[in-house]
Amino acid sequence: MQIRVRLTAGLAELFRAPFLTIDLADGATVADLYARLAETEPDAAPALRSALAVVAGGHAGRDDLLRHRQEVALLLPISGG
Protein backbone atom coordinates (compact mmCIF):
# COMPACT_ATOMS: atom_id res chain seq x y z
CA MET A 1 0.00 0.00 0.00
CA GLN A 2 1.08 3.59 -0.48
CA ILE A 3 1.20 6.17 2.30
CA ARG A 4 1.63 9.89 1.69
CA VAL A 5 3.87 11.46 4.32
CA ARG A 6 3.79 15.19 5.03
CA LEU A 7 7.09 16.30 6.55
CA THR A 8 7.40 19.46 8.59
CA ALA A 9 10.31 21.66 9.64
CA GLY A 10 13.57 19.77 10.13
CA LEU A 11 12.24 16.52 8.71
CA ALA A 12 11.48 18.17 5.37
CA GLU A 13 15.05 19.44 5.33
CA LEU A 14 16.51 16.01 6.15
CA PHE A 15 14.48 14.30 3.41
CA ARG A 16 14.84 17.26 1.03
CA ALA A 17 11.10 17.22 0.32
CA PRO A 18 7.88 18.35 2.03
CA PHE A 19 6.03 15.18 0.95
CA LEU A 20 7.01 11.55 0.35
CA THR A 21 5.11 8.55 -0.94
CA ILE A 22 6.15 5.40 0.91
CA ASP A 23 5.28 1.82 -0.05
CA LEU A 24 4.43 -0.43 2.90
CA ALA A 25 2.96 -3.91 3.23
CA ASP A 26 -0.76 -4.23 3.94
CA GLY A 27 -1.35 -4.22 7.68
CA ALA A 28 1.57 -1.86 8.34
CA THR A 29 1.56 0.36 11.41
CA VAL A 30 2.83 3.83 12.16
CA ALA A 31 5.92 2.14 13.68
CA ASP A 32 6.53 0.40 10.35
CA LEU A 33 6.37 3.77 8.62
CA TYR A 34 8.93 5.25 11.04
CA ALA A 35 11.22 2.26 10.44
CA ARG A 36 10.98 2.61 6.65
CA LEU A 37 11.70 6.33 6.85
CA ALA A 38 14.76 5.69 9.04
CA GLU A 39 16.00 3.12 6.51
CA THR A 40 15.51 5.63 3.70
CA GLU A 41 17.32 8.45 5.50
CA PRO A 42 19.43 7.18 8.44
CA ASP A 43 20.37 10.74 9.48
CA ALA A 44 16.68 11.34 10.25
CA ALA A 45 16.43 8.50 12.80
CA PRO A 46 17.05 10.71 15.88
CA ALA A 47 14.39 13.22 14.79
CA LEU A 48 11.92 10.46 13.94
CA ARG A 49 12.18 9.11 17.50
CA SER A 50 10.60 12.32 18.80
CA ALA A 51 8.19 12.94 15.91
CA LEU A 52 4.43 12.89 16.45
CA ALA A 53 2.28 11.23 13.78
CA VAL A 54 -1.04 12.86 12.91
CA VAL A 55 -3.64 11.01 10.85
CA ALA A 56 -7.05 12.49 9.95
CA GLY A 57 -6.47 15.40 12.32
CA GLY A 58 -5.67 13.30 15.38
CA HIS A 59 -2.67 11.75 17.09
CA ALA A 60 -1.74 8.31 15.76
CA GLY A 61 0.03 5.89 18.08
CA ARG A 62 2.88 3.76 16.83
CA ASP A 63 0.69 0.64 16.92
CA ASP A 64 -2.10 2.22 14.84
CA LEU A 65 -2.77 0.55 11.50
CA LEU A 66 -2.38 2.54 8.31
CA ARG A 67 -4.61 2.36 5.23
CA HIS A 68 -3.74 2.59 1.54
CA ARG A 69 -3.39 6.20 0.36
CA GLN A 70 -3.68 7.58 3.87
CA GLU A 71 -1.82 10.80 4.64
CA VAL A 72 0.36 10.95 7.74
CA ALA A 73 1.81 14.25 8.93
CA LEU A 74 4.95 14.03 11.03
CA LEU A 75 5.42 16.87 13.49
CA LEU A 76 8.52 17.58 15.53
CA PRO A 77 8.19 18.97 19.06
CA ILE A 78 8.69 22.69 19.48
CA SER A 79 11.20 23.86 22.04
CA GLY A 80 12.25 27.23 23.24
CA GLY A 81 11.48 29.73 25.88
Where are the model-predicted features located?
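Ubiquitin-like/PB1-type beta-grasp interaction modules and other compact soluble beta-rich domains
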Residues: M1-G80
